[in-house]
């Protein structure tokens, strides 16, 4: 480790201990050498004893800076790793940092646009940032070519070295977790860190975010439910993104929404519809739908429309995952726990040798109490969370796409119930899920599949005779190969039998010759001939097997 890394590591450990986070380590794991080392190098007391453990962890991560703040935000979605009182505190982490100088942002923009002055492309460029976060910050301007208002998102110029340095240390700390925590190996800390690193590096590439926003906008073109601002790809690069500036009410500002006469029930239900449409119709969903990224249009408050921004994190499900997920939801709310267990095995989410009866009983034990509440009070996200936590006890592999989905569903539910506390998520979602499943297995699905495959089949049709001929030839060759292998095996079997017989005779001759040589020396050359015969017989047997 370099001196700089050692200083940073010392600061990280110092911060953790000053917030008393050594409480996370069971006392039995704090050995005498570890206690001596802690006293010698880190003698500071816990200065925040009045705060609960979850709050102390949140404050420590905030003190360590943006990389750790975003790491804590990601961990808040992994409720299989932490109890609720810690996960809830991590969810409160705010990705707010001091903005960097507007002149630096201007230099970044000019560099991304080929070194030309910013005035070449934009009018009314604001040096003061509109918003600032750990990865990037946003400035306003107008496009010179058409006068449209835009926002320019610029990556922080100094962020990559900071991320690389801190990620190195996070990996080192992750390697210590299995040694310090009794359940550390099951938590797979290095996999968690790898997942976080991928998410973080994806956010550093604004071309990826631009592509995500363009795709999402296309999916909801002319939709009354969701509006995605237009991206101007000609101005986008890895370090800069330009998109239409929008005006709306933050979805968390309930008072402002009510003041303009927004239909709150319809708005809440549309949030659910947007989520399930993204997941099941489009297989492409915005996976960072926290309140800071969602606005509501000022227009048509009686027919409200969401506005979505910041598409840096997206998720997708394949066709099989979508089907299993939809059937899981319906089976869950029908209390058909046997089907839930079987679906998990069929999908490959849990190992194929899982005892279905035990799995069904575990799901029933954990989830049956949930359904004692009225359906309107049941949290979809927490149902999914309980299901995944139970499945992990049966060695369910972590599915990154399902973790993203669960996090997004919790956001959608939280926002929906904040807008309209009586929101019945199940009543809103069930018709959509049932219709989707019916659409996947009915005649329309067969017609669609035929239409999708027909061009491929038509293209391949002239090749069918040749393919049939090749198949027959391969079948003949395979049969010849099988016959040869069977014949060789028979010959080998016969030779092995002969070898065993010869080895037996050779052993008898050697033993007889040896005994006669010891006990009947008067027999002269006979013992020697017997031993020589035994050796020769062994050699013949060995040749048979080689």
Curated annotation (Swiss-Prot):
GO molecular function terms noted in the UniProt entry: ATP binding; protein kinase activity
Predominant location: membrane
Pathway stated in the Swiss-Prot or TrEMBL entry: Cofactor biosynthesis; ubiquinone biosynthesis [regulation]
UniProt-annotated catalytic positions: 288
Enzyme Commission number(s) from the entry: 2.7.-.-
Domain Protein kinase intervals: 124-502
GO CC annotations on file: plasma membrane
Top class in the EC scheme: transferase
Keyword Membrane: yes
Xref: SUPFAM superfamilies: Protein kinase-like (PK-like) (SSF56112)
Taxonomic superkingdom: Bacteria
Binding site for ATP: 130-138, 153
Topology term for the membrane: Multi-pass membrane protein
Family matches, as NCBIfam families: PRK04750.1 (NF003404), UbiB (TIGR01982)
Family indicated by similarity: Belongs to the ABC1 family. UbiB subfamily.
HAMAP family (alphabetical): UbiB (MF_00414)
Protein's name according to its UniProt entry: Probable protein kinase UbiB
